[in-house]
């Protein structure tokens, strides 16, 4: 299986088309990021291992399938990544939530890390690292660096975004060829300011109504 996947589910593509529109309000944008995050989680979790468990229904005892004991952590890259968390938690409410805080230096376009707060047992968890955008790839690379420094296993890390630029995908794959990348759309390119084209604008500003 390829370590890069564009999730082409019709509901995801439909909601993404509405999310991209410049006239979408902050409320609409926030709700759509939440919904797409939930749908992406459904697709990304397809390969979670199952185990047989014996239960008792009102009629009789039986053997059923349930997700095996592996624990999950959702780790948003702040601030925009926080918009995807609630949608995923609706599907996987027992997941722990960590945070990696970064901002982009507007002159160098390089990410600056200011916060890392993770579950103590992050090394034993499956990790959904989430950020709506994969632009230059700098923030994602630094975030994966931070996870690996804290003994997270590469095979347990899945980077999940809504829109990606080819440049960002290439950079992340070159820096961390051992993690999986999922996106709802692979866009055309980055512009001279480091923004994805056609993209959806600044996801953080659109989520929180800031400039």
UniProtKB/Swiss-Prot annotation:
Its cofactor is Mg(2+). It holds the Pfam family UPRTase. Transmembrane segments: none annotated. It catalyses: UMP + diphosphate = 5-phospho-alpha-D-ribose 1-diphosphate + uracil. GO terms for molecular function: GTP binding; magnesium ion binding; uracil phosphoribosyltransferase activity. 5-phospho-alpha-D-ribose 1-diphosphate binds at residues 79, 104, 131-139, 202. Keywords: Allosteric enzyme, Glycosyltransferase, GTP-binding, Magnesium, Nucleotide-binding, Transferase. Allosterically activated by GTP. Pathway: Pyrimidine metabolism; UMP biosynthesis via salvage pathway; UMP from uracil: step 1/1. CDD domains: PRTases_typeI. InterPro entries: PRibTrfase_dom, PRTase-like, Upp_B, UPRTase/APRTase, Ura_phspho_trans. It is an enzyme of class 2 (transferase). Uracil binds at residues 196, 201-203. Binds 1 Mg(2+) ion per subunit. The magnesium is bound as Mg-PRPP. GO terms for biological process: UMP salvage; uracil salvage. Its EC number is 2.4.2.9. NCBIfam families: PRK00129.1, upp. Belongs to the UPRTase family. Catalyzes the conversion of uracil and 5-phospho-alpha-D-ribose 1-diphosphate (PRPP) to UMP and diphosphate. HAMAP family: Upp_B. This is Uracil phosphoribosyltransferase.
